[in-house]
Curated annotation (Swiss-Prot):
Involved in base excision repair of DNA damaged by oxidation or by mutagenic agents. Acts as a DNA glycosylase that recognizes and removes damaged bases. Has a preference for oxidized purines, such as 7,8-dihydro-8-oxoguanine (8-oxoG). Has AP (apurinic/apyrimidinic) lyase activity and introduces nicks in the DNA strand. Cleaves the DNA backbone by beta-delta elimination to generate a single-strand break at the site of the removed base with both 3'- and 5'-phosphates. PANTHER family: FORMAMIDOPYRIMIDINE-DNA GLYCOSYLASE (PTHR22993:SF9). It holds the Pfam family H2TH. Its EC number is 3.2.2.23, 4.2.99.18. It catalyses: Hydrolysis of DNA containing ring-opened 7-methylguanine residues, releasing 2,6-diamino-4-hydroxy-5-(N-methyl)formamidopyrimidine; 2'-deoxyribonucleotide-(2'-deoxyribose 5'-phosphate)-2'-deoxyribonucleotide-DNA = a 3'-end 2'-deoxyribonucleotide-(2,3-dehydro-2,3-deoxyribose 5'-phosphate)-DNA + a 5'-end 5'-phospho-2'-deoxyribonucleoside-DNA + H(+). This is Formamidopyrimidine-DNA glycosylase. InterPro entries: DNA_glyclase/AP_lyase_DNA-bd, DNA_glyclase_Znf_dom_DNA_BS, Formamido-pyr_DNA_Glyclase, FPG_cat, MutM-like_N-ter, Ribosomal_uS13-like_H2TH, Znf_DNA_glyclase/AP_lyase, Znf_FPG/IleRS. GO terms for molecular function: 8-oxo-7,8-dihydroguanine DNA N-glycosylase activity; class I DNA-(apurinic or apyrimidinic site) endonuclease activity; damaged DNA binding; zinc ion binding. It comes from Streptococcus pyogenes serotype M3 (strain ATCC BAA-595 / MGAS315). Keywords: DNA damage, DNA repair, DNA-binding, Glycosidase, Hydrolase, Lyase, Metal-binding, Multifunctional enzyme, Zinc, Zinc-finger.
Length: 275
């Protein structure tokens, strides 16, 4: 699943490709992807001009002025821009024809991606309903708030970080990286973390997600950015996908566990499980 660094990289690519373009027609082949009224979606988008492309957590925000098209890539979603003819592909599901003759295509092998067309004035309520946590920046991701939320919960730390309420944008890859960097076992109850561990989790979340953005995201399976290029963050992953390799910090072999139903990579020496 594209996580915050991948979605931010897609956002930057889309802004380069479609900023200022007018949508003249929309073709939707998988109606279930649209979570708001289908007729409104089909009739309202033509004539709209793409004013900016933003992001909140793992959501892309295509700003149309008074409206925002909220796009979530889920497991396999990606955007492609074709300057003229669009090739046949059974995984191409949404087509945005632009006034300059090009077509922005949403591709999704799993068909899990979603679209919501909402009034810009309703955007805050949209994310509040989903209990989406703050962006992972020093200005918004406050240590004291993070600490209070952790210490009041019995949830294991990995599923807690994944649920998007503590901080927006973390997925399986980057949670494994953050937990390793902070020397925290993924099954540790949130309330049992000490202040030093909480601070490390906070600081490493900010650092690692920023590094992921800098490196253009991780191409581990099928991720490509909006320009069709791979990311390079996979070359900087310390534990995710490194089963059997030596821990870069202590030399112990990395092992793979199941935590909350998710494949999880840890160093058993650096990330000791509490009794």
């Amino acid at each position: 699943m594209p996580e915050l660094p991948e979605v931010e990289t897609v956002r930057r690519g889309l802004e380069t490709l479609v900023l200022g373009q007018e949508i003249v027609a929309v073709t939707l082949k998988v109606p279930k992807m649209v979570k708001t009224d289908l007729e409104t979606f089909a009739l309202t988008l033509p004539g709209q001009i793409i004013q900016s492309v933003g992001r909140r957590g793992k959501y892309l925000l295509i700003d149309l002025g008074q409206l925002v098209l909220v796009s979530h890539l889920r497991m396999e979603g990606k955007y492609l821009l074709f300057p003229d003819e669009v090739p046949d592909n059974k995984h191409f599901h949404v087509f945005f024809e632009l006034k300059n003759g090009s077509t922005l295509v949403y591709q999704d092998v799993r068909k899990f991606g979603t679209f919501d067309l909402i009034a810009k004035s309703q955007l805050s309520a949209f994310f509040a309903k989903r209990k989406l946590g703050p962006e992972p920046k020093k200005e918004t991701f406050k240590l004291k708030t993070f600490e209070a939320a952790l210490l009041s919960s019995q949830k294991p730390i990995k599923p807690h970080l994944l649920d998007q309420t503590l901080v927006a944008g973390l997925g399986n890859i980057y949670v494994d990286e953050v937990l390793w960097a902070a020397k925290v076992h993924p099954e540790t109850a949130s309330s049992r973390l000490n202040k030093a561990e909480i601070k490390r989790l906070h600081d490493e979340t900010i650092r690692i997600l920023a590094l992921g953005i800098e490196k253009g995201g991780s191409t581990v399976r099928t991720y490509r950015n909006a320009l069709g290029a791979d990311g390079t963050m996979q070359d900087y992953l310390q534990v995710y996908g490194q089963t059997g390799k030596s821990c870069p910090r202590c030399g112990q072999a990395i092992v793979k566990l199941k935590v909350g139903g998710r494949g999880t990579h840890i160093c058993p020496k650096c990330q000791k499980k509490r009794p």
